[in-house]
A protein has these predicted regions:
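Alpha-helical transmembrane segments and their helix-helix packing motifs
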Residues: 1-175
Length: 175
């Protein structure tokens, strides 16, 4: 039931927020690496799809990128976007505001380190030169597309992304 799902989410969030910061940081590294690997999958599908219809290309890209969130959930890693669900435990009075914010900061930094690690492995492994350099050009084109959003557009797209991750995590705990 929704009430049981909320109780479960509160307890999981309270557990995450009360974990030792080092464990949250390591879990954050794992999640950051998973999302970075998903971006590798996404980039590969987008690089190889020049002649495919736009909608099909985006569907395949979205499906393979979703593997990142699936890996995070299966591994029990901490992704910043899902860690913001600790707000449920804060509202329920199970954790303090300090515990919640500390968790957010530690997990965010862990995600950054995990993503940076995969980026370094990709760079030093020469993956950017795959498909005669087209793989690396796809990364650059994706980045260029992202920086052309206004601040307001980027903020709202971030909210939409966070909602989608929340729903995915919530659904995984409701089964």
């Amino acid at each position: 039931t929704p009430v049981e799902a909320t109780d479960y989410a509160e307890n999981v969030a309270a557990y995450k927020a009360q974990k030792r910061p080092f464990l949250s940081f390591m879990s954050g590294i794992s999640a950051g690496a998973c999302i970075a690997l998903a971006f590798v999958f996404y980039t590969t599908t987008q690089t190889a799809s020049a002649g495919a219809p736009w909608g099909l290309t985006k569907l395949v890209g979205g499906l393979v990128f979703s593997l990142g969130v699936i890996m995070v959930v299966i591994l029990g890693s901490e992704l910043f976007t899902s860690s913001t669900l600790t707000l449920v435990a804060r509202v329920g009075g199970k954790i303090t505001t300090t515990q919640m914010i500390r968790n957010w900061i530690v997990v965010y930094l862990g995600n950054f380190v995990g993503g940076l690690f995969i980026a370094a492995v990709i760079w030093f492994g020469g993956q950017t030169m795959a498909a005669n350099g087209q793989w690396g050009l796809t990364i650059l084109a994706t980045a260029q597309h992202k920086i052309h959003h206004t601040w307001f557009e980027a903020f709202n797209l971030g909210i939409l992304c966070n909602i989608m991750v929340w729903v995915a995590v919530w659904m995984s705990s409701s089964g």
